[in-house]
Amino acid sequence: MSYEVDSKKTILITEDIFKMLPVSSPLSVYPFKNCAVVGNGGILKNSSCGAEIDSSDFVFRCNLPPTTGNISKDVGNKTNLVTVNPSIIAQKYNKLNEKKTEFLENIAAYGDAFLLLPAFSFRSNTATSFKVYHTLKEFKATQRAIFFHPSYLKSLAQFWRTKGVKAYRLSSGFMITSAALELCENVKLYGFWPFSKSIEKMPISHHYYDNQLPKPGFHAMPKEYNQILQLHGKGILKLQFGKCESD
């Protein structure tokens, strides 16, 4: 099988790897009625969107964000699927060669969510993604690791390229938004705001938990956001721009 981005490189799907893959779609109960896709934008701070997010039938999150403590009133607790960037596993948990307990304690907040990994995007992602899978199995964790199919991500990139989104790679948030539109009847996005000021012109951090900016040139964020705005304008999805109304 060819990798998504390293497309000249291939991986042999051995019996051991095949056993790691689900027999049928783990999301076979779709379409879900109301879905929340929660980005990590600083606009979520003091938004009071937590209760609204948690009332959704299915909640998508990106890159293992914090959801516990005071922040939960803004971002919610519920998580059904969360993407995992293997670089986080490498940097924060030393590729799970150690720090397995710390990793398992941190992901406990996600309950029985799916951890979605890009194991077949770059060859360098494979071993770390598999390590997450095996760690969850070894410790009988309630979460389950699943992998993006490289052909799906290639098709997705190809589709958005025809709409003008030409990037080295689509961002996790944009991939998950695209998947949610296929899996859900109604999609609402929270925390998608790639600007340094809010609508009220107040300065905000890049993420709700830090101000670390993305690598320049890797994703086409402005073009992605333009597409999201167009989808919002057409009523295909809803975009939450500011505070949520509390009951």
Across the structure, where does each feature detected by a protein language model lie?
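Metal-ion/cofactor- or nucleotide/acyl-coenzyme-handling active-site neighborhoods
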Residues: 1-247
